[in-house]
Design a protein with these regions (language model features):
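Beta1/beta-strand and adjacent pyrophosphate-binding region of the FAD-binding site
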Residues: 2-15
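Redox-cofactor binding/interface segments in oxidoreductases and associated redox assembly factors
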Residues: 10, 143-144, 270
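Glycine-rich FAD pyrophosphate-binding loop
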Residues: 12, 21-44
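Conserved Rossmann-like nucleotide-cofactor binding loop
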Residues: 15, 38, 148
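A conserved beta-strand/loop capping segment in the N-terminal third of enzymes
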Residues: 52-104
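Predominantly flavin-linked oxidoreductase catalytic cores and closely associated redox partners
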Residues: 106-239
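FAD/FMN-dependent oxidoreductases across multiple families
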Residues: 217-288, 292-299
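C-terminal helical "tail/cap" subdomain of flavin- and related membrane-associated enzymes
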Residues: 298-363
Length: 363
């Protein structure tokens, strides 16, 4: 680099790319580091709420141009019970490949320098260290490494979760007319003992099935677990009948759902999953990524590096309500004794589902 940048952004997912867009449009010299050489289809984040779509629009990305599937309703399945409720506003199902590509292109167009294949591994004395031994320095660093752990920044979930950690799984299901008819314009949540599965159709017509399951339930190969779940839960089994098992199942270990932290040092802005990891059934992971980026950019413009601690405290405070509610629903949903009553309540009081959908957004 010929001149020292004003800021380094680690990670070119929605949080990092969103921050790079805002910073670069404000005239800052930005270096955006991305560990992968090509944009991939990340495991999490296929659901974009109405609020997330509005944040994308503020960055100049029209949700309609992403070509996603319109999502108008949410379905719950628990045992023999089910519910279906209209969402407060229309959402979208879109692949992370499509979303991340659009955000990265916007960041480059805004003037950010995107450097691919650079794996940042640690922060020491305000400098970013990379796997190949390089050291990059800037007055401010925006840490947006997603769900990947980052050396020196442990993310410890609650004690009960540490005893039985959560694994994230994802199965891509090819487009099929019968599956389209089954799922339609819904995002589905299939609740089961010690876990849940979320299903939504995406931009290319495929369906994204993501699971959060405790390690004690995994008991072996992910495919074997999915097949058992399909046998035990007929509605999920109907969907899994369209699976192409040759595609393989993506996995990420020890996801610290429910963790959040409001502590940082001057010059370090922690974004997205590096600030807090909301249970994925809330469908707000991408919302938090973009909202944290927006808030960090605003704070930086007013106070540069020194604004980081205040930004982090304020972001953690904003996370309090949606995280508490999402954690409660998660615990109820993965417990067989409470999942069915929860679903019955959703069927009897759809207004409560819509209220919860709004309350789990980051205000």
């Amino acid at each position: 680099m010929s001149t020292r940048p004003d800021a380094i952004v680690i990670g070119a997912g929605p949080a990092g790319a969103g921050a790079a867009i805002g910073l670069a449009r404000g005239g800052a010299k930005i270096v955006l580091l991305e560990r992968s050489r090509e944009t991939g289809d990340a495991l999490c984040g296929g659901f974009l709420s109405w609020q997330t779509l509005a944040r994308l629009a503020a960055l100049g990305i029209d949700g309609a141009t992403l070509g996603g599937q319109v999502v108008r309703r949410v379905r719950l399945f628990a045992g023999a019970r089910s519910s279906e409720t209209m969402l407060p506003e229309a959402a979208t199902g879109v692949s992370r490949l499509r979303l991340d590509s659009a955000l990265q292109a916007a960041a480059v167009a805004a003037g950010a320098g995107l450097e691919r294949g650079v794996h940042a591994t640690a922060l020491e004395g305000g400098a970013v260290q990379t796997r190949d031994g390089a050291e990059l320095a800037a007055p401010s660093v925006f840490l947006a490494a997603g769900k990947h752990g980052f050396r020196g920044f442990p993310r410890e979930p609650a004690a009960w979760q540490r005893e039985d950690p959560v694994i994230g799984l994802r199965l891509r299901m090819p487009q099929a007319a019968a599956l389209d008819r089954l799922v339609g314009d819904a995002v589905e949540l299939h609740l089961f003992d010690r876990g849940y599965a979320g299903l939504v159709r995406q931009d290319d017509g495929s369906a994204n099935l993501c699971l959060a399951v405790h390690k004690s339930r995994l008991g072996g190969a992910p495919e074997a677990l999915l097949r058992r779940l399909g046998d035990d839960h007929p509605r999920l089994g109907e969907r899994l009948a369209f699976a192409d098992w040759s595609r393989g199942i993506d996995a990420i270990g020890h996801v610290p759902y429910g963790w959040r932290d409001g502590v940082t040092t001057p010059g370090l802005f922690r974004l997205g999953d590096q600030a807090g990891v909301i249970p994925s059934l809330a469908g707000e992971g991408m919302g938090i990524a973009l909202a944290s980026a927006e808030a960090a950019v605003t704070a930086w413009r007013h106070g540069t590096a020194g604004a980081a601690p205040g930004f982090q405290r304020a972001l953690a405070a904003r996370m309090t309500r949606p995280f508490a509610l999402a954690n409660l629903i998660w615990r109820l949903g993965e417990n067989p004794r409470t999942a069915s009553p929860l679903t019955a309540c959703a069927a009897a009081a759809p207004w409560l589902v819509r209220l919860t959908s709004r309350a789990t957004r980051l205000g």
